[in-house]
């Protein structure tokens, strides 16, 4: 357990992966039930559900072309804040066809683990496949459907608020005594802010002097 990662867990199911079409779902997710028919009923055989990047998201990102083909997987160590407008977060729900698994994913999975070991992520195999000239993996962006990845107690608390019945949600927000920034889609009309300050020029000046401001004051 302390020497492997999810690429090893998936490799244990190598035989079963090649027997039929597969839905791959990570176990730390909570999500709207509509995501299942959304991906299953889509006619494209190899899909990854993705969501436009928001500040709470962590882990593997992807970049898409105009046809929603995945052109690159961006691992956590290659994340660049200056590119966040181009990023989509993998929801970690995938649909793979038997043919794709048999002819591409499993062979690359075996080669990857032999070369780099078992302490890796299965998304890295997908990253290699996207470098091929004829990659068959597309993205299916969400359109506001709820989902959350739960890694700790704080994530669980946020997810319980997001998925609470509408009539219970406001009291749960208010129990937090702030921290609304963790909910990017929440508009807080009681928060005392000046929508005209800072202006764009001042923000650019602060960015330009950020290193000095951070380290010398």
What are these regions (language model features)?
Residues 1-20:
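Conserved N-terminal catalytic core of the sugar/cofactor nucleotidyltransferase
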Residues 63, 95-97, 149, 188, ...:
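Short, well-ordered beta-strand micro-motif
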Residues 56, 80, 101-103, 147, ...:
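Short, acidic Gly/Pro/Ser/Thr-rich loop/turn segments
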Residues 164-216:
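N-terminal "arm"/small-domain region of PLP-dependent enzymes with the aminotransferase-like
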Residues 20-30:
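Short beta-strand-to-loop acidic/aromatic patch adjacent to the donor-nucleotide binding site
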Residues 32-116:
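Conserved core of the sugar-phosphate nucleotidyltransferase
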